[in-house]
From Swiss-Prot:
Cystine connections: C2-C11, C3-C8
Protein name as it appears in the record: Conotoxin ar5c
Signal peptide: none
Keyword annotations: Disulfide bond, Secreted, Toxin
Entry's localization field: Secreted
Amino acid sequence: ACCVYKICYPC
């Protein structure tokens, strides 16, 4: 998964 500022979402 891709994570930015503790928010993760599918890549």
